[in-house]
Amino acid sequence: MAIKVGINGYGRIGRNILRALYEGKHGGAIKIVAINDLGDANTNAHLTRYDTVHGRFHGDVHVDGDSMVVNGDRIRVVAQRDPTKLPWAELGVDFVLECTGLFTSKAKASAHIAAGAKKVLISAPGGDDVDATIVYGVNHGVLKSSHSVVSNASCTTNCLVPLVKVLHEKIGILAGVMNTVHSYTNDQVLTDVYHSDLRRARSATMSMIPTKTGAAAAVGLVMPELKGKIDGFSIRVPTINVSFVDFTFTAARKTTVDEINGAIKAAAGGALKGILAYNDQPLVSVDFNHDPASSTYDATLTKVIEGTLVKVCSWYDNEWGFSNRMLDTLLAWSKAA
C-alpha cells in the first residue's frame, strides 16, 4: 500500500517534490493526498504545469473543486495557517513533508502530529530537538520507526557530505572550509530593501552577495567525528538555479589529484551511485539543471598543493536534487525498523 503524504508549503521545494514523484521512480510507493498552501488551487495548478526553471510538466494537471488532479490522482488543496487544524487525520496522512521553512524544530513541526499525521520530514536544517538529521546515501541507515520528526538537512549539506564521506574515509580530513556559490532564492529581494543583514538587503539580481550558511557546520550532525572541523559561507549569485560547492581541506596524509579523483569516481559508480555523480567535462552551471544527483563532482577542478592542501568542487541542482532526496529519505524512513 502506498504511503499517504501531505505537503505543507507548495513553493519551490514542495512543487518539485510533486514533479519528482511523477517523473521518477517512487510513484507506486508514495501517494500525495493533500497540499496545504495559502495560494488557491488554480494558481498552484498553473505553477505545477509551467515552471521557469524546470520547464513544462508533461502530465495532466487540472482543478476539480477544492482538489488538484494530477494524472488522475486527486490531491486536496487546503489553505490553513494553523497546522494543528490541518485535515491529516481525516485523510489518513502517514508523513508530512514540511516545506514552508517555518516549522523547522521538532516542537513546531509536531503540530502536524497533533493534527493526525504520524511523522514529519522537514525540508530544511532542523532544530537541536529533531530526532535525526539525514543526508540520504550517507546516514539514512540511522532512521528508526520510532522517530517522529526528522530533518533532511539542506541542499548544500546534501551536496557536501557525500564528498566529505568519501574523502574522510579514503584520505582523512583534519579541517576544512566550504564556500557555496549559490543561486539566489526567494528569501532574497529583487530590489534593495531593509534587512538586518546589510548584504541581504541588496538586490539579488545585481550582485554577488556573501552571506552565512549552516550547511558546513551541519556536517557534524551527519558525521559526528567531524563536528567543529568544517565551516563555511555562501556567496549568492544572480542565477536562478544550480549551485556549486568549493571545499578546501587539510588532508591527514599526503595525496594526489589522481588519488582523489579516483576515490570519488569509484564511489560515484558504486555505493553512492545516483547520489554522487562524476564529471570530467568542461561544463557550466546550466548543464546541471534538472539533475537528480545530490552532488556532481567536477574532476577538472581538483587541486592539491604540497600533498596535503586540497581543493575539490561539486555542482548541484539545489532544487531538483534535494527534492529527489526528500522522496528517497521518506521511503527509507517508511521501511525503517
Please place each PLM-identified region on the residue numbering:
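Short, flexible turn/loop "capping" segments at secondary-structure junctions
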Residues: 142-144, 200, 237-243, 304-307
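Catalytic core of tubulin tyrosine ligase-like
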Residues: 170-234, 240
